Amino acid sequence: MLHISALEKLVHELSRLPGIGPKTAQRLAYYILRTGNEYPERLSEALLRVKAEVHDCPTCFNYTDTDICRYCEDSHRSDESICVVEEPSDIMRIESSGAFRGRYHVLHGAISPLEGIGPKELKIKELIDRVEDGLSGTGPAIKEIILALDADLEGDTTILYLAKQLQGKGLKLSRIAHGVPIGSDIDFVDDRTMGRALQNRVEL
């Protein structure tokens, strides 16, 4: 059986992180080795703590380590608009733009038949439940849904599906403008472009 050294194992695990290639993983591993014991211990503690304490917000499905996330808890935000995103990291990009002061809903992905991801694998039913709770008076009344999904095939497929599901519910339904380049990931769009894309959103 081929022996894998502790260093090789660390490089392998680091290279599995998104955006981290083998060379970057190797540099990170050597940095960790050079720092002595204190930093690796703090890093290990932070990783274990985030896995133990962070969970989905029961309302919007953003990550939080409290009962509900800061955006759902903030009484100064508008209940009338919900911005739908694919991933929790997309919220940080939108918040940095300063162009949105409503609520959020995280789908945790996008429809991708090739990867076996359909509507049931996403938080789509929960979004529709929020809308219907508003219509019945058991939840905040929602007037607008803004779809801030990635500008790729999966994002477009998800937008078409959501538009069909939300038809006839008296909502203003819009998607962010094409200031976001085709094929781009929301998480890599700069603040100014994201702000313009939200302000110039297109009604569906």
From Swiss-Prot:
All residue ranges annotated as the Toprim domain in the record: 80-181
One annotated GO molecular function: zinc ion binding
Function: May play a role in DNA repair. It seems to be involved in an RecBC-independent recombinational process of DNA repair. It may act with RecF and RecO.
Zinc-finger ranges (C4-type): 57-72
TM helices/strands, residue ranges: none
Organism per entry: Bdellovibrio bacteriovorus (strain ATCC 15356 / DSM 50701 / NCIMB 9529 / HD100)
Keyword set, alphabetical order: DNA damage, DNA recombination, DNA repair, Metal-binding, Zinc, Zinc-finger
Gene Ontology process terms (BP): DNA recombination; DNA repair
One Pfam family in the UniProt entry: RecR_HhH
The protein's name in its UniProt record: Recombination protein RecR
Similarity field: Belongs to the RecR family.
Annotated gene: recR
Gene3D superfamilies: 3.40.1360.10, 6.10.250.240, RecR Domain 1 (1.10.8.420)
